[in-house]
UniProtKB/Swiss-Prot annotation:
It comes from Bacillus cereus (strain ATCC 10987 / NRS 248). This is UPF0751 protein BCE_A0020. Belongs to the UPF0751 family. Pfam families: DUF2325. InterPro entries: UCP020408. It comes from the Bacteria. Keywords: Plasmid.
Length: 99
């Protein structure tokens, strides 16, 4: 089962419901740094197959840390221009089907 990390927004429960219907797993992080994101991001990025950043709902620091770890652990990093959970999930699933 594929795992998609979605960064940004506030729709974690909705994403989990949508993921169950699509036979994949979602890890959700709101993208806020809460005083430090490196440790948190490192652990979740190691567990996922693709990262989707919701640009409209994620801060620059979080995006920069996600880029750093995506490169380090060779995990594809994709961007959703808005902040809708359905769009983020679709982008991740499309990438996984092509890869």
């Amino acid at each position: 089962m594929s795992t998609i990390l979605v960064l940004g927004g506030s729709n974690g429960r909705t994403l989990e419901k949508l993921a169950k219907k699509r036979d994949c797993q979602v890890i959700f992080h709101d993208g806020k740094n809460h005083g430090g994101v490196k440790k948190t991001f490192r652990s979740v990025i190691k567990k996922c197959d693709v990262i989707v950043v919701q640009k409209g709902a994620c801060g620059h620091v979080s995006i920069d840390v996600a880029k750093e770890y995506a490169k380090k652990y060779d995990v594809p990093l994709l961007f959703n221009q808005g902040f809708g959970g359905t769009g983020a999930l679709e982008i991740g699933l499309k990438h996984l089907q092509v890869a």
